[in-house]
């Protein structure tokens, strides 16, 4: 049912240099001394010139919108709305400084805050932007509307030029290139956004050779968020990225998984627990956490590992719950 691929290797570039030698004159004249001093001065001047040029050419670090700590809330204007499906929108919020970047790192999220007009308690929810952390001028959220979800309903009711409060970044799992040999992303619904953030970071870094397997569960095909982006990764990196989709209500002719993410599916597509340096990330609704890995106790407490991953023999250290 699933195909497997061989992994590519990148070829290193080589550089060469040539050295020159000169023969000192036999004359006892002071001319060589003057020449040496002159050349030394020329060398210093050339070094200073080149150093100055290098400094001038080095790109200045862009200002960051979110700096954490005691910064407080940052109010941003909604500048663009894109309808992705019957219940999902992509919302773009612009930064006051067009040259600024978000200041987020991998993996991290932002808090959003909405104050109801009736003066009731503010609604605060975390969201992981889907725009690149190095993108200047704006950030984007992909938001699915949930019944009785006050923040998602508010975001879907917003119009261009209205404003929303943000705060962050909220640190999650610190990533660095090649931290793990193979990672697996098990996601449900909007739990895909931190997974996409992590996968995008891995594949945009040519030094990072991490393999990535995605298992993504949804109700219907229309609910698969960021599918185009993941298909682009599959087409560009077929030897390092695989995606498996599971639907509760699949359409006729669907060739992916059906129903829920099962123990049999995960046993088939995930690396074995005995493999070295692997990590499994889980993010989704409460029911999925309960079935796959067990819930988190708090943002800082991962809780015990239970569910399917425990039954398959994975250890607590091999699993991270967003």
UniProtKB/Swiss-Prot annotation:
Transmembrane spans: 30-46
Keywords: FAD, Flavoprotein, Membrane, Mitochondrion, Mitochondrion outer membrane, NAD, Oxidoreductase, Transmembrane, Transmembrane helix
Compartment list: Mitochondrion outer membrane
GO biological process terms on file: ergosterol biosynthetic process
SUPFAM superfamilies, per the entry: Ferredoxin reductase-like, C-terminal NADP-linked domain (SSF52343), Riboflavin synthase domain-like (SSF63380)
Membrane topology: Single-pass membrane protein
UniProt EC number: 1.6.2.2
Reaction catalysis annotation: 2 Fe(III)-[cytochrome b5] + NADH = 2 Fe(II)-[cytochrome b5] + NAD(+) + H(+)
Domain FAD-binding FR-type: 71-176
Record-linked InterPro entries: CBR-like, Cbr1-like_FAD-bd_dom, FAD-bd_FR_type, Flavoprot_Pyr_Nucl_cyt_Rdtase, FNR_nucleotide-bd, OxRdtase_FAD/NAD-bd, Riboflavin_synthase-like_b-brl
Cofactor names: FAD
Classification via PROSITE patterns: FAD_FR
GO CC annotations, alphabetized: mitochondrial outer membrane
GO molecular function: cytochrome-b5 reductase activity, acting on NAD(P)H
Residues bound to FAD: 179-214
UniProt similarity note: Belongs to the flavoprotein pyridine nucleotide cytochrome reductase family.
General function of this protein: May mediate the reduction of outer membrane cytochrome b5.
Protein name: NADH-cytochrome b5 reductase 2
Organism: Emericella nidulans (strain FGSC A4 / ATCC 38163 / CBS 112.46 / NRRL 194 / M139)
